[in-house]
Design a protein with these regions (language model features):
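Non-catalytic structural scaffold of enzyme domains
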Residues: 1-227, 231
Length: 237
């Protein structure tokens, strides 16, 4: 689930890792964006979506929204202890692990950056790297509206990133599942700068697969159907 279309970036990786599973995707575009709403409202919206998914018979859940993860995933796990639940968070750890001492920008919604979960990440890794949060209110709407390139998007990147881009900036963490769909235009904006773009879609999908496997829920069977060969038809006469 996600607040809109962004979680499709996680679904894409999950399908690659678990091709034998059946997936249901719920994008709550009616209430998007979550990232500018109060925490209590985000929690209520997330629970409403999860209850719909449970009615559909799901056996596992990926909360493919950084904002919903921060606001609700802990309470979801307490409420549904038997359900494998994974969330997503800005991929700060991989960025720091791969860092060579340069600046790391973290693009995310205002609510994600404000939440305790991100603040704990920041506190944990701030001594190891120069981490700069970049508040990107309004960016996910470009994806929701299908505006994945163009001058308006370039102008947005210029407004948000130009003040914090330095010669030693080495990575940008895409801290919202919508943002990977903007990679091409972001690279166009960055030009010839050698900056690594990092997102958490693959890591979230791997964790979902791991939890399903631990609980014996991962589907590994495969059904094969064939039409009779000419030789088989001859034998049956």
């Amino acid at each position: 689930m996600d607040s809109g279309l962004g979680g499709l970036s996680v679904l894409r990786e999950a399908i690659k890792l678990m091709p034998k599973e059946d997936f249901i995707y719920y994008g709550d575009s009616l209430h998007a964006p979550y990232g500018v709403k109060p925490q209590a409202e985000i929690r209520d919206l997330t629970f409403a979506v999860v209850e719909k998914l449970l009615d559909m018979g799901i056996k596992g859940l990926a909360v493919a929204c950084n904002t919903a993860t921060s606001a609700a995933v802990r309470l979801l796990r307490n409420t549904y202890p038997e359900l494998p639940i994974v969330g997503i968070e800005p991929a700060v750890k991989p960025a720091v692990t791969e860092s060579h001492g340069g600046r790391i920008l973290v693009m995310a919604t205002p609510m994600t950056l404000k939440q305790e979960k991100f603040q704990n990440l920041l506190a944990k890794y701030r001594e190891q790297a120069d981490i700069v949060p970049v508040q990107c209110d309004g960016l996910m709407e470009f994806v929701e509206h299908g505006d994945l390139d163009g001058q308006e998007l370039d102008d947005y990147f210029a407004e948000k990133l130009s003040p914090v881009l330095t010669d030693d900036t080495e990575s940008i963490v895409l801290g919202c599942t919508h943002y990977p769909f903007l990679k091409k235009e972001l690279r166009h904006f960055l030009g010839d700068r050698d900056i690594h773009l990092i997102d958490g879609s693959l890591g979230t999908s791997r964790e979902l697969m791991r939890r399903l496997k631990v609980q014996g829920l991962l589907r590994t069977d495969c059904l094969l159907y064939t039409s009779p060969s000419p030789r088989d038809r001859t034998r049956s006469r």
